[in-house]
């Protein structure tokens, strides 16, 4: 496909994504407060919310998709900002499963697998460390949601000002068509709301998958050729910026971090060069939720999207910028890779335990 045509397709897919977010919001509003309360009763506990964020992201293999859904839920009033913030933190952890799974593809070659698994799990350990430190602070003092709310009010006006979405009118008509479609099938009330939610979710997932695929075709091949040359000469700050820019370009932190795995496995990219790129990917991936917030009708949805960005920026400033904390994920990932090389089955157990079993237990106990 010609480059110009593919770029136009990406723009159309982003529009489709916004339609999906608005459909999700409209469906939840139709379902009503009682249904919403039952639907989200399992996430009233912040730790349960964290676990739901992990599981939801693992399920759809995209933190962009899961945080966009969370933004839609907040916009509809089904979820409060306090409930949503732990969820987006969980999404940060859940998204790292992709590059960890990619690293398992090198399992037959010990030296390659050791380097690949370390490069993958350094992202896991940083995100877990960030959540372990910042979630308790957020629950007590609320600095993340406070900063996000302050920025949100600067952008849309002080409290009490009606939030007028700049893209709402662009997606209003297609959402109306979806409502009319389900009306023709005789759906009403909660059934219609559930169908709108399901339709919106399908649209969001399909649109994001196609955006990712086409953006990768546009830019990722060039990125893979030049990334190591850039990072080999640059310090952590430039690597961080590369992670942000690449992730915004391809609309997927998983692609950015997964590109690093074969480079690390081959020994052409060091763990310390790969590490800051993954942190930049954390920040870059939040652009999707910010975009979703533009299609929502509530200032709280923008607050949650900004909270995701704020959390990642604070995590980098407070952990990566400090030499002691910066080394913790590197040391942990290196040690985990040593263990995984000696007992490869433990690598598989780690993936299931970290991303599925532990979150499921958390939800089951704390709901």
Predicted stretch roles:
Residues 53, 57-60, 68, 168-193, ...:
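Long, highly hydrophobic alpha-helical transmembrane signal-anchor segments
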Residues 3-13, 86, 118, 194-201, ...:
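Alpha-helical transmembrane segments of integral membrane proteins
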Residues 13, 17, 21, 45, ...:
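Alpha-helical transmembrane segments in multi-pass membrane proteins
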Residues 18, 101-169, 202-209, 213-214, ...:
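Juxtamembrane and boundary regions of transmembrane helices in multi-pass small-molecule transporters
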Residues 1-50, 178-240:
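Helix-loop-helix hairpins and the membrane-proximal interhelical loops
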Residues 24-39, 43, 70, 143-159, ...:
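Hydrophobic alpha-helical segments of integral membrane proteins
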């Amino acid at each position: 496909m010609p480059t110009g045509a593919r770029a136009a397709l990406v723009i159309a897919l982003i529009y489709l994504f916004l339609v999906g977010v608005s459909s999700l919001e409209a469906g939840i509003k139709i379902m009503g407060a009682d249904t919403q309360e039952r639907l989200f009763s399992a996430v009233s506990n912040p730790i349960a919310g964290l676990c739901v964020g992990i599981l939801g992201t693992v399920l759809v293999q995209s933190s962009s998709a899961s945080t966009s859904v969370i933004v839609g839920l907040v916009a509809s009033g089904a979820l409060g900002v306090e409930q949503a913030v732990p969820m987006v933190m969980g999404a940060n952890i859940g998204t790292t499963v992709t590059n960890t799974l990619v690293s398992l593809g090198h399992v037959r070659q010990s030296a390659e697998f050791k380097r690949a698994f370390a490069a993958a799990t350094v992202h896991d350990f940083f995100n877990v460390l960030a959540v372990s430190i910042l979630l308790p602070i957020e629950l007590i003092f609320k600095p993340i949601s406070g900063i996000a709310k302050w920025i949100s009010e600067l952008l849309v006006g002080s409290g009490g000002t009606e939030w007028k979405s700049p893209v709402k009118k662009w997606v209003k008509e297609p959402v109306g068509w979806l409502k009319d479609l389900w009306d023709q099938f005789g759906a009403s009330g909660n059934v219609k709301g559930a169908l709108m939610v399901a339709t919106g979710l399908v649209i969001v997932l399909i649109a994001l998958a196609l955006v990712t695929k086409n953006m990768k075709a546009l830019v990722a091949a060039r990125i893979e050729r030049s990334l190591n040359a850039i990072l080999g000469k640059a310090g952590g700050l430039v690597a961080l910026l590369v992670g942000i820019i690449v992730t915004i370009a391809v609309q997927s932190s998983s692609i950015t971090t997964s590109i690093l795995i074969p480079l690390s496995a081959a020994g052409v990219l060091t763990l310390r060069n790969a590490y800051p790129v993954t942190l930049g990917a954390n920040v870059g991936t939040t652009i999707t939720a910010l975009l979703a917030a533009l299609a929502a009708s509530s200032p709280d949805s923008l607050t949650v999207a900004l909270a995701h960005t704020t959390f990642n920026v604070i995590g980098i400033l407070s952990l990566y910028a400090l030499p002691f904390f910066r080394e913790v994920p590197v040391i942990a990932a290196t040690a985990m890779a040593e263990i995984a090389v000696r007992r490869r089955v433990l690598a598989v157990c780690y993936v299931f335990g970290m991303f599925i079993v532990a979150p499921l237990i958390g939800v089951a106990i704390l709901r």
